[in-house]
């Protein structure tokens, strides 16, 4: 185990308050900016154990057969993400950091993007390379040598909250993103309706895997510290509200529409590096 930095990594304040205690783990909130953080948290050695090969097979699956109907269904579930990035970039090189099995990248490839990924799991990396034919680099993003100013789109789907050093992750992104490239980040938000309604049972806490807990405000501020401006955002509909209204027969057809009026589990943003920061 190790302690989180004493000063908030976002604003530098040291004042904190307990946000939630779950399964003997404690998550605090910076009283100045609102960034949530796990403290104490797993050490680097423990992190490597947490993300052993079985992490994916225990929490997800063992990698779907690319010829199966289940695989095609899984790729269809990634299409909303592909549509999200295509609203700002129609083509180009996509790098997915924390790509897991590579399903999102496979969906992107089907839409004409050139794709590659990064992940710490040998199990998932091997599957992506051997079963899907997707080039994936094995290792921590800060330890890898990535091509400079090469990628048009860099994505982090539920990656940043796992990173022991999110500042380092953003520094890497800045170095390998093209001048006109975009960064896409998706993180759980503890300010969303789902978290606020479920709280203790909300799966976005995901202790001890999630080191950081964002709100839309802290995510935008974090990106700003690295010279990025948010140009597009997406607030997923509330699954809690959808399920609630879906149980009422007469309202079931409108449950999804009603749920869109409430913030959901996660927030996604597209950010671009400010022109004034590109030389820094």
What are these regions (language model features)?
Residues 1-149, 153-157, 167-170, 234-238, ...:
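Conserved N-terminal segment of class I S-adenosyl-L-methionine
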Residues 142, 156, 164-172, 176, ...:
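S-adenosyl-L-methionine-dependent methyltransferase catalytic module, highlighting the catalytic core
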């Amino acid at each position: 185990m190790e302690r989180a930095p004493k000063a908030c990594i976002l604003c530098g304040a040291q004042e904190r308050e307990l946000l939630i205690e779950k399964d003997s783990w404690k998550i605090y909130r910076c009283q100045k900016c609102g960034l949530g953080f796990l403290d104490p948290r797993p050490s680097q050695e423990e992190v490597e154990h947490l993300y052993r090969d079985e992490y994916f097979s225990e929490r997800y699956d063992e990698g779907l057969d690319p010829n199966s109907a289940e695989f095609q269904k899984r790729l269809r579930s990634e299409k909303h993400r592909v549509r999200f990035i295509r609203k700002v970039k129609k083509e180009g090189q996509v790098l997915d950091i924390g790509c897991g099995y590579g399903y999102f990248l496979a969906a992107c490839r089907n839409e004409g993007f050139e794709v590659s990924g990064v992940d710490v799991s040998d199990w998932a990396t091997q599957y992506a390379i051997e079963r899907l034919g997707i080039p994936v680099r094995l290792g921590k993003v800060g330890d890898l040598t990535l091509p400079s100013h090469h990628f048009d789109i860099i994505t982090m789907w539920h990656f940043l909250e796992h990173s022991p050093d999110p500042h380092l992750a953003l520094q890497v992104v800045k170095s390998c993103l093209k001048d006109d490239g975009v960064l896409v980040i998706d993180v759980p938000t503890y300010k969303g309706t789902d978290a606020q309604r479920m709280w203790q049972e909300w799966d976005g806490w995901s202790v001890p895997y999630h080191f950081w807990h964002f709100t839309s405000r802290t995510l935008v501020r974090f990106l700003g510290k690295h010279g990025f401006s948010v140009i597009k955002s997406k607030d997923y509909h509330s699954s809690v509200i959808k399920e609630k209204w879906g149980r009422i027969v007469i309202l079931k057809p409108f449950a999804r529409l009603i749920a869109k009026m409430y913030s959901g589990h996660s927030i996604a943003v597209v950010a671009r590096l400010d022109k004034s920061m590109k030389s820094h």
